Regions:
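Short alpha-helical donor nucleotide-sugar binding micro-motif in glycosyltransferases
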Residues: 266-267, 274-279
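A conserved mid-protein helix/loop that constitutes part of the nucleotide-sugar donor-binding site
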Residues: 25, 205, 209, 214-228, ...
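Short His-centered aromatic/hydrophobic patch
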Residues: 103-108
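Short hydrophobic beta-strand element within catalytic cores of glycosyltransferases
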Residues: 304-307
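Aromatic "clamp/platform" in nucleotide-sugar-dependent glycosyltransferases that forms part
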Residues: 287
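Conserved acidic donor-binding segment of nucleotide-sugar-dependent glycosyltransferases
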Residues: 322-330, 338-344
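Membrane-proximal helix-turn-helix segments that form the acceptor-binding/catalytic region
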Residues: 91-94, 141-158
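Short, structured helix-loop element that forms part of the nucleotide-activated donor/catalytic region
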Residues: 52-61, 234-260, 271
Length: 378
């Protein structure tokens, strides 16, 4: 088949460029690389502002690094925004002149049938089993399950990010999927400057969690475990609350009385780079993940990581990280104490991390694999 240049539409994310979540990073990395390879890519951004506040809005132009940006009407109401943008995005994609429409996340796939009806090749990436997340109300969870079933029935290809999700679709639906993981890129280590000014942090003086403040990330366990660890190191909890302000307030209440625990809110740019670059360890205590980009990024910065034993984490780190039993506060406490007391072990894991993760997960290779999947019947 001739290698024709493709017209591609991506939707299901909030906005690019942004770090509002892992999906936004994935869409940006794929879209910009596909444009660099000569394809035409359009991304449907939600209307409205960054979930952590309009002060974090980054880009309002109609193009970003060659990627066309179109704003999709969105009802900016908690629990409704994702649904409304996927409905209007699905309609617009159906009538657009695209070879491929790529839906990201389960919920938006509820509209996948419409572009498919209009003859588009439709691909779905399942970034995680979103209906299992605590934050969704009954309406949102029902819509997400509808999206999952639509993807199974109508998608030409389904991409999954972990073996456990691949097994889920095979066991529940008998549906074959393609495993194409997320990627990571090599970075430049930054010395502590801004984070010293803002939080008094220096190299190796803190344990880092970075991600959205949502229940399934296991932050409750992390705070409870850390409070019982005898260490001078601080615990930095970096991330925005998204649709879950109530949960973020619950976490801050739980952390009360321990001045070592610092909530930074949403971070990006230099502050984010410095936090990754200077952490003693990075921890991801999640109960539920798709494929955690923050974990890939943390390892690319040469971090020793402590992760829960869910397969989505263990498949990434293999034997290059410390692992604790999911949801087990006492086991997490033991791992934190081991890390704080065994600096040589931490140093060994730090030294292995960057080369291991950057050779295993390469964005250029992943973009090409995705394009090969797009070309299936075109």
């Amino acid at each position: 088949m001739a290698r024709k240049k493709l017209k591609i539409c991506m939707l299901g994310h909030k906005r690019i460029p942004s770090r509002e979540g892992g999906i936004e990073i994935v869409v940006e990395e794929l879209a910009t690389r596909m444009v660099a390879l000569g394809h035409e890519v359009t991304c449907y951004n939600r209307s409205g502002h960054h979930v952590s506040g309009k002060e974090f809005d980054q880009h309002k132009n109609k193009e970003y690094k060659g990627v066309k940006l179109k704003t999709i009407f969105t009802l900016n109401i908690k629990g409704i925004a994702a649904m409304s943008s996927s409905v209007f995005g699905g309609i617009r994609a159906a009538f657009g002149k695209y070879d491929v429409v790529h839906f990201h996340a389960e919920g938006p796939c509820a509209m996948l049938w419409l572009p498919k009806l209009f003859g588009k090749r439709c691909v779905a990436t399942i970034h995680g089993l979103d209906h299992q997340r605590e934050k969704w109300n009954k309406l949102a969870s029902t819509y997400i399950m509808l999206g999952e079933k639509c993807a199974v029935k109508f998608a030409d290809e389904i991409i999954v990010l972990s073996e456990s999700v691949q097994n889920y679709f095979e066991d529940i639906y008998g549906r074959k999927t393609r495993f194409i993981p997320n990627g990571v890129k090599k970075i430049e280590i930054k010395s502590a400057g801004l984070i010293t000014e803002k939080y008094g942090l220096t190299k190796d003086s803190y344990i880092l969690f970075l991600g959205r403040l949502v229940p399934e990330k296991g932050i409750r366990y992390l705070i409870e475990a850390f409070k019982d660890v005898q260490t001078d190191k601080k615990l930095i909890i970096a991330g925005g609350s998204s649709d879950t302000d109530e949960f973020a307030n619950e976490l801050k209440e739980l952390a009360k009385g321990d001045e070592r625990i610092i909530f930074t809110g949403f971070v990006q740019g230099q502050e984010l780079e410095e936090l990754y670059s200077n952490a003693y360890i990075y921890t991801l205590p999640s109960d539920l993940e798709g494929m955690p980009l923050s974990l890939l990024e943390a390892m690319s910065y040469g971090n020793c990581c402590i992760v829960s034993n869910i397969s989505e984490c263990t498949e990434v780190v293999e034997d290059k990280a410390m692992i604790f039993k999911k949801s087990d506060v006492s086991d997490l406490k033991i791992r934190l104490e081991e890390a704080c007391n065994q600096s040589e072990m931490v140093k060994v894991l730090k030294n292995q991390a960057t080369e291991f993760i950057c050779s295993k997960y390469n964005w250029d290779k992943i973009a090409q694999e995705t394009l090969n999947l797009y070309r299936g019947n075109i």
